Amino acid sequence: MQHPILVIGHRQGIGRAIAEQLCQAGHTVLGVSREAVDYQHSHLTSLTFAAEDLTVEHLPETLSGVVYAPGSINLKPFKSLKPADFLADFHINALGATHVLQVAEKALKAGQGSVLLFSTVAVSQGMPFHASIAMAKGAVEGLARSLAAEWAPHVRVNCIAPSLTDTPLAAKLLGNEARAATAAERHPLKRVGTVADIAEISCTLLRSTWISGEVIGVNGGMGRLRTA
């Protein structure tokens, strides 16, 4: 990947892990986050503003890839969800990605680039209290497949659908040993995911030149396996 890779949401969590792994591999990364990052690397240029404020002027003429990592975990009983909840989840997950990709389309096509979006295992596996986020992430999966077809053969577009991953966003769900143990037990591989797990497959998908239109489950076996 000889041109810069745009990573949206590189301050923490999965986005940070991807940005750091790309930099360590020698790739040039342009990171965008709402808040300033607390790390530096010679291959990293960080911009501090919301993804919705991204413009063509912020980008190089050519990109090797775009990673859209922002997300939300808004778990509520269906009867408690308000229209604002659905709109907030859709805005950050689906519309945010849409804006970034519309801005980056020309640079991606110039670089024969790769796009990586993020869904959740809850789209394919029915889970209580996930109605809002599953709807929003389902839209992300549809976006990934549609753009993979529309932008072929110039740009590859893929999506990762993780299960629960140990990130700041998931801190409330993994806030003590009991909760963490319960979460781990739900997975056939008996642990929750790490940002390193997600970053590893993310970088593979960004590099691959013959994978497109796929939603890849990285979920400790939760998506396919039943062990009890």
Segments predicted by a language model, with ranges:
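A glycine/serine/threonine-rich, flexible loop-to-helix segment
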Residues: 164-186, 225-228
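Substrate-binding pocket helix/loop in short-chain dehydrogenase/reductase
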Residues: 77-78, 82-88, 179, 183
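N-terminal Rossmann NAD(P)H-binding glycine-rich loop of SDR-like oxidoreductase domains
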Residues: 11, 15, 19
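Conserved Rossmann-fold SDR core element
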Residues: 141, 151-165, 211-218
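Catalytic loop of short-chain dehydrogenase/reductase
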Residues: 112-139, 144-152, 164-165
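C-terminal substrate-recognition "lid" of short-chain dehydrogenase/reductases
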Residues: 192-218, 223
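Conserved NAD(P)H cofactor-binding loop of Rossmann-fold oxidoreductase domains
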Residues: 67-75, 221
